[in-house]
Regions:
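Helix-to-loop junction immediately C-terminal to a conserved catalytic motif
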Residues: 48
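Conserved ABC transporter NBD signature motif
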Residues: 56-67, 72-73
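Conserved ABC ATPase "signature" region
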Residues: 97, 101, 108-126
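Q-loop/switch helix immediately C-terminal to the Walker
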Residues: 88-102
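ABC transporter nucleotide-binding domain
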Residues: 173-188, 192-257
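Conserved ABC ATPase signature
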Residues: 130-134
Length: 258
């Protein structure tokens, strides 16, 4: 269970989180969406204990101070496209081995699990390389595997699908769905891609300028907000690369081809 009540956080002079309140039950997949500077990453940092709120109440899995609760930290994993966990000067394989030791995992069980994850995330050929030699998508696959090593009860994914090929991305999201069912875990997921959120999440929290302006089902947000945003495009011949659309400006969109 994650409980937030009247959470406020300033960064400099900016009020990034403004009286945020909600609770998340075990076995929920929750998408946290919003335009750039809406407060998504700061919110996850507060939940993870990386940042302390200026005011308000927070409880994560029974703990009111996640950052100082070692048992709770082992149950929580935070994978970010902007904040990396792998050691830069070590091979990916060495980072995994360090993670097994750091989390005090059963070595035999952890290595068997690691072998399974390396196969699923298609990184067997990458583990002998250093992170700086990897492409963004390759690195994110390795970061995701590292984040899953300790079989976390709460998994936070902050733009963690960036750079991934579509086929790999949706295979990974299927895995997360199965993982949640098997572990009765909680997944918090931020993305600019609403289609990703639809595929992974049951519930959406929409932030705007640090406040919650919507909290409900995927179906409800589509019904209430989708009619407000439309984009018309004309093209001939080969379709443009829609991955290059400026989503940070327009947000995600649905596309209908006629």
């Amino acid at each position: 269970m994650i409980v937030l009540k009247d959470i406020c956080k300033k960064l400099g002079e900016n009020q990034v989180l403004d009286h945020i309140s909600f609770h998340i039950s075990p076995n929920e997949n929750v998408g946290i969406i919003g335009l750039n500077a809406a407060g998504k990453t700061t919110l996850l940092n507060v939940i993870a204990g990386v940042l302390k709120p200026d005011s308000g109440f927070i409880r994560v899995g029974g703990s009111e101070n996640v950052f100082e609760d070692k048992k709770m930290l082992r149950k929580l994993s935070y994978v970010s496209g902007m904040r990396h966990q792998l050691w830069e000067d070590l091979r990916v394989k060495d980072s995994f081995e360090n993670g097994i030791k750091m989390y005090h995992l059963d070595e035999k069980r952890a290595k068997a699990r690691l072998e399974e994850l390396e196969e699923l995330f298609e990184i067997k050929d990458l583990v002998h390389m250093r992170p700086q030699k990897l492409s963004l998508g390759e690195r994110m696959r390795c970061e995701l595997v590292y984040g899953l090593l300790a079989e976390p009860q709460i998994l936070m994914l902050d733009e963690a699908m960036i750079g991934l090929d579509v086929s790999v991305k949706y295979k990974i999201m299927e895995y997360f769905q199965e993982y949640r069912k098997k572990r009765q875990s909680t997944i918090l997921f931020t993305s600019h891609n609403l289609m990703e959120v639809e595929n992974l999440c049951d519930r959406i929290i929409l932030l705007d300028k640090g406040t919650v302006i919507f909290d409900g089902s995927v179906e409800r947000i589509m019904k209430e907000f989708a009619p407000l945003y439309r984009m018309k495009m004309k093209t001939e011949g080969v379709l443009p690369d829609f991955d290059d659309l400026p989503l940070e400006k327009y947000g995600s969109c649905r596309m209908e081809l006629k």
